[in-house]
Curated annotation (Swiss-Prot):
Lineage, broadest ranks: Bacteria, Bacillati, Bacillota, Bacilli, Bacillales
Gene Ontology biological-process annotations: menaquinone biosynthetic process
Pathway: Quinol/quinone metabolism; 1,4-dihydroxy-2-naphthoate biosynthesis; 1,4-dihydroxy-2-naphthoate from chorismate: step 5/7; Quinol/quinone metabolism; menaquinone biosynthesis
Protein name from the UniProt record: 2-succinylbenzoate--CoA ligase
InterPro entries listed in its UniProt record: AMP-bd_C, AMP-bd_C_sf, AMP-binding_CS, AMP-dep_synth/lig_dom, ANL_N_sf, ATP-dep_AMP-bd_enzyme, MenE
EC annotation from Swiss-Prot or TrEMBL: 6.2.1.26
Enzymatic class: ligase
Lineage: superkingdom: Bacteria
Family listed: Belongs to the ATP-dependent AMP-binding enzyme family. MenE subfamily.
UniProt keyword list: ATP-binding, Ligase, Menaquinone biosynthesis, Nucleotide-binding
GO molecular function: ATP binding; CoA-ligase activity; o-succinylbenzoate-CoA ligase activity
Job of this protein: Converts 2-succinylbenzoate (OSB) to 2-succinylbenzoyl-CoA (OSB-CoA).
Organism: Bacillus subtilis (strain 168)
Catalytic activity: 2-succinylbenzoate + ATP + CoA = 2-succinylbenzoyl-CoA + AMP + diphosphate
Keyword Transferase among record annotations: no
Length: 486
């Protein structure tokens, strides 16, 4: 049984040292240079007393130094916590404390003093000018050891740390390669944040495959199209809003592109039809932080025939649909359950959540769906109430808990509303103790929530719709509203 592997970056630098690992802005970095830069950062972190077994959080925008930081953690034997740059300070502080992080790697674009009372903050730009401490790097990765921790909001509204092992990341990369293929010409463009699994997973594919990553700090349709043509990019990870922008900007898919891996929810028919007309090879997918990226993928040849399907499981992965403890027949609706070597080890320090989420080795996703008679998966509802806005996940319970802490709010319900630009945005439905303005509630949320989680509109109700068990019926909120707060 495979229990350990040589450090991926170390071995890749030995195998193909002069091959291009990373292109970022005007920087071109070979695998040998990537290893040297990451090892140097590891030695500089060691001079700050970062040691094997520690936990370090990373709060950085997409940039070369973030890539170095992730690999430096692995070379030190340190668990890396990837923090979402869009979150509020309040949200990040919770994750730092909950994860047991002792160090925070960041830069001048973030206010370090806001975190100094609970962690040692290290500015990576200052760090790279400092002296280093000679270390013995961790030459091997233990497959069952936690490599990264990413936080995902749960239905209770409290974020949970997803423990992703080296084995999870490795088998995710291998399963993806068996599905999408690999060529020596492949270059994968990432304009999604590296703190999301869809972005981070490409870094690991890079060192495992020996493939170039073309990294962008953020998505700009003109910059991405220029980069695709300049660097002959063959693959790109995207969400629906990115794909729509690319389609608006060009009449034909760039010749070098062979795969657009689409995440963040099923694509609508008009978008898929336009992709087919313009020759965009879209691979729809279904996955989550807990599965270390995609676990189900639909190839372009099935995109119209199996409209709305997320596809079939990757090699070594399994899916099934269950309802009331019984496996469902084809087309019968139930909960999607997944199993495979890329499925997370567990939620960090969440015993009750782990007991509720795992059943005989299967992960209960909380998503509803069905399989057709050929085994293609159709996702009916993303974790029933999840709002996907511009590729970002918004859990109503998390937003509701913030609104309920406001003195004017007696009850709160949040659901998604269609939005032309973002796909969906959150709307809040409130029962009030006393009058309050939408502006006051927006300002209150700004201090406690990421910008994309703040409700776009607030509505007043006499009472929230609930079932006999007093469970909030979010799908009925829109019909129960009385008037909009201004």
């Amino acid at each position: 049984m495979l229990t350990e592997q040589p450090n991926w970056l170390m071995q890749r630098a030995q195998l193909t040292p002069e091959r291009i690992a990373l292109i970022y802005e005007d920087q071109t970095v070979t695998f040998a240079e990537l290893f040297a830069a990451s090892k140097r950062m590891a030695e500089q972190l060691a001079a700050h007393s970062v040691r094997k077994g520690d936990t370090a959080a990373i709060l950085l925008q997409n940039r070369a130094e973030m890539v170095y930081a992730v690999h430096a953690c692995f070379l030190l034997g340190v668990k890396a916590v990837l923090l979402n740059t869009k979150l509020s300070t309040h949200e990040r502080l919770f994750q730092l404390e909950d994860s047991g992080s002792g160090f925070l790697l960041t830069d001048s674009s973030f206010e370090k003093k806001e975190y100094e009372h609970i962690v040692q903050t290290i500015d990576v730009d200052e760090l790279m000018k400092e002296a280093a401490e000679e270390i013995e790097i961790e030459a091997y990765m233990q497959m069952d050891a936690t490599a990264t921790l990413m936080y995902t909001s749960g239905t209770t509204g409290k974020p949970k740390g997803v423990q992703q092992t080296f084995g999870n990341h490795y088998f995710s990369a291998v399963s993806s390669a068996l599905n999408l293929g690999i060529t020596e010409q492949d270059r994968w463009l990432i304009a999604l944040p590296l703190f999301h699994i869809s972005g981070l997973s490409a870094l690991f594919k890079s060192v495992i495959y020996g493939m170039t990553v073309v990294l962008h700090q953020r998505f700009s349709v003109s910059d991405v199209l220029h980069s695709i043509n300049r660097h002959e990019v063959t693959m790109i990870s995207a969400v629906q809003t990115m794909l729509a922008s690319l389609l608006e900007e060009t009449n034909r898919c760039p010749e070098s592109i062979r795969c657009i891996l689409l995440g963040g929810g099923p694509a609508p028919l008009p978008l898929l039809e336009e992709c087919r007309e313009k020759g965009f090879p879209v691979f729809q997918s279904y996955g989550m932080t807990e599965t270390c990226s995609q676990i189900v993928t639909l190839s372009p040849e099935f995109s119209m025939e199996k409209l709305g399907s997320a596809g079939k499981p990757l090699f070594s992965c399994e899916i099934k649909i269950e309802r009331d403890g019984q496996v469902c027949e084809p087309y019968e609706h139930g909960e999607i359950m997944v199993k495979g070597p890329n499925v997370m080890k567990s939620y960090f320090n969440r015993e009750s959540a782990n007991e509720a989420s795992f059943q005989n080795g299967w992960l209960k996703t909380g998503d509803l769906g069905y399989l057709d008679n050929e085994g293609f998966l159709y996702v009916l509802d993303r974790r029933s109430d999840l709002i996907i806005s511009g590729g970002e996940n918004i859990y109503p319970a998390e937003v509701e808990s913030v609104l309920l802490s406001h003195p004017a709010v007696a009850e709160a319900g949040v659901s998604g509303a269609e939005d032309k630009k973002w796909g969906k945005v959150p709307h809040a439905y409130l029962v009030l103790h006393k009058p309050v303005s939408a502006g006051e509630l927006t300002d209150y949320c700004k201090e406690r929530l990421a910008k994309y989680k703040i409700p776009a509109k607030f509505f007043v109700l006499d009472r929230l719709p609930r079932n006999a068990s007093n469970k909030l019926l979010r799908n009925q909120l829109k019909d129960a509203r009385k008037g909009e707060l201004l």
